[in-house]
Curated annotation (Swiss-Prot):
It comes from Schizosaccharomyces pombe (strain 972 / ATCC 24843). It comes from the Eukaryota. GO terms for biological process: thiamine salvage. This is Thiamine-repressible acid phosphatase pho4. InterPro entries: Acid_Pase_AS, His_Pase_clade-2, His_PPase_superfam, Histidine_acid_Pase_euk. It catalyses: a phosphate monoester + H2O = an alcohol + phosphate. One of its GO terms (cellular component) is fungal-type cell wall. The active site is at 69 (nucleophile), 341 (proton donor). It is found in: Secreted, Cell wall. Glycans are attached at residues 98, 104, 186, 221, 251, 328, 433, 439, 458. Its EC number is 3.1.3.2. Induction: Repressed by thiamine. Its main location: secreted. One of its GO terms (molecular function) is acid phosphatase activity.
Amino acid sequence: MKLSGISLWLLAASIVHAGKSQFEAFENEFYFKDHLGTISVYHEPYFNGPTTSFPESCAIKQVHLLQRHGSRNPTGDDTATDVSSAQYIDIFQNKLLNGSIPVNFSYPENPLYFVKHWTPVIKAENADQLSSSGRIELFDLGRQVFERYYELFDTDVYDINTAAQERVVDSAEWFSYGMFGDDMQNKTNFIVLPEDDSAGANSLAMYYSCPVYEDNNIDENTTEAAHTSWRNVFLKPIANRLNKYFDSGYNLTVSDVRSLYYICVYEIALRDNSDFCSLFTPSEFLNFEYDSDLDYAYWGGPASEWASTLGGAYVNNLANNLRKGVNNASDRKVFLAFTHDSQIIPVEAALGFFPDITPEHPLPTDKNIFTYSLKTSSFVPFAGNLITELFLCSDNKYYVRHLVNQQVYPLTDCGYGPSGASDGLCELSAYLNSSVRVNSTSNGIANFNSQCQAHSTNVTVYY
């Protein structure tokens, strides 16, 4: 049938005024801030899982929080050899300002023209420190956790287990102020665990409390080789593309490219915006994200033989406290621990979160495969967390559920919740005895002590 001109016009008009939902996929915007690896600002992951509401006909009985510190300044490095360190970035910034790295300000629409009037916010003297936004993140999270689990807060004082680094302790304090306000000092008992081998299996910095792993630099060479391979693939094309924005005769090195990127991401962490980020394309941000993911996959993560050892002690402690809750062997209901991203990933690996990445099948280092489980941007952004919930449901059975950054991480290896549907829950005994985690839930502490030749300790902590 041949349509008249007026019919075509009416058809076009009706399409314009119709709902757009069927074509929204073509209009999705790329949010680069959600893809900055472990330096990402806090955001919820993209699990598309069940609702975070408490399951119907279930009562919350325990909550366990494993919490990363909030947004921070770059870490310190007195030798200024680490490209991501505050000292290295500070030196690079000065080179941009004094012309040692010569921006071509006469190049039309140079995205670096702002450098003429730019005042750096990254300072070497602030290395390692929690940022103001990091304090706000933790305060707000503390408030939200208290409101969500209010019925469990029925004792006078709560243990706050924290790794010893200042930014972690500060984060724990701000979180506690969010929970208890001015009454924080009276409501908390801070247990500060050293970040060295004296903490043994109680550590919240397992890399440093495992002498065999730390002293022998296990995973260091394989991780560096993975980075070298991948950076040889993706960094040089960025340097070639950006060279035109600098005076002729100056060619960016791959370290220069990484420095520009780190200024971008840390300015985002410190003040939520950065003109340097306009230098990079969406694909390039995803490739930097992959570089971060390689780090946490190979260094104590699921691509390492040591992941279940390093994460298993926490998992065993968690499992023991879940069992005590069921057996009425303890009246503790709230378990709080504050740590680093490098602690959380091995724990999640020991829990079976990354089944597609193994020592036998690690992430490739010659290409970005995009569809893989361990996205550090989603699992351990600044202020990232892992929450474990224990429920007693109307069928008189106990169930477990995990939340990652306040979104349900659906458990698929141990059955279903009381609804009989895939709702992210597992019945407790099935959860503890699932083949993906039973070695950690049952033997994690013993494995850590024996394989690490860890120091014994008389301190008892509860995660």
